[in-house]
Amino acid sequence: MPKFIAVKLIPKGPFRDIPRADTLFGAIGNAISAIHGQSAVEELVDAFVGGARISSAFPYSGDTYYLPKPLSVEPALEGILTGLDEEERYTTAKRLRKAKYLDLKNFELALRLRPFTIPEEIPYARVDVPRVVLDRVTQDSSIYFWEEIRFREKSGVYFLYSGPREVFDGYIAPAMRFLGDTGIGGKSTWGAGLFEVEFHEMKIDAPGSEYSVTLSNALPTKTPVLWRLLRKGGWSFGRRKPRMTFIAEGSIVKNDPGGMERLELGLSHEVYVYGLTFPLGVELPEGLE
């Protein structure tokens, strides 16, 4: 049974968004650069090219951890819902298709295409918050809105780490403690993205298979089996990064580690875009293998 380190972010306030793996890796790299210098970032990149992995962040509530619904369940819904009458099967299938997350127990069932249930609710909400900006010349005010994520009590986000313990202790753990005070995802001066961090062991009972569900958004090197596309851009030290096409968490791949992109943005150092898969074995319905 695969064993991972769960990096649990206990929020001190709202987050701008739930960070994906490329955002987490970029933040970790920036933290390591601030702590140890740019040469340590190159060592971190080498460790991940050599096999270390992080997942995207997902919500938790207390001791309940949520994971992305594998896309492999959607073509298998007819078999999963066997035994239900037509109306109930239609209603349940509609809810299953809309579901984004499953708790750990039902995620493990979904990996094996066994009947599973979806959570009644998730432990956060997206909220539009009004802000006021003043014109520097006229002092006229205007209102704008920005979206933030607010968590329920005893809830937050976590991500998984897989790889050598020395890489975690030397890079990931100190970087996350640093980021807890400086913030992740922007607007830390407003109190967003600040957190306390805890580390826990987490096991996931996944089947042995040459097919995998990725728990990170990834830049595939082969054609995925089942996928949902995700376009992401962003900024790095004031320079705009090009929009890149990822496959989203929950996509299904076959023996594909993904890739890491190096960008030249006219800075004193290269910028790395994390696109490695975080694979867990998954069973596929007949006809897709």
Swiss-Prot record:
It comes from Thermococcus onnurineus (strain NA1). Probably part of the Csm effector complex, that includes Cas10, Csm2, Csm3, Csm4, Csm5 and mature crRNA. Interacts with Cas10 (csm1). Encoded in a type III-A CRISPR locus. Belongs to the CRISPR-associated Csm4 family. CRISPR (clustered regularly interspaced short palindromic repeat) is an adaptive immune system that provides protection against mobile genetic elements (viruses, transposable elements and conjugative plasmids). CRISPR clusters contain spacers, sequences complementary to antecedent mobile elements, and target invading nucleic acids. CRISPR clusters are transcribed and processed into CRISPR RNA (crRNA). The subunit probably binds to the 5' handle of the crRNA, helping in discrimination between self- and non-self. GO terms for molecular function: RNA binding. Keywords: Antiviral defense, RNA-binding. GO terms for biological process: defense response to virus. This is CRISPR system Cms protein Csm4.
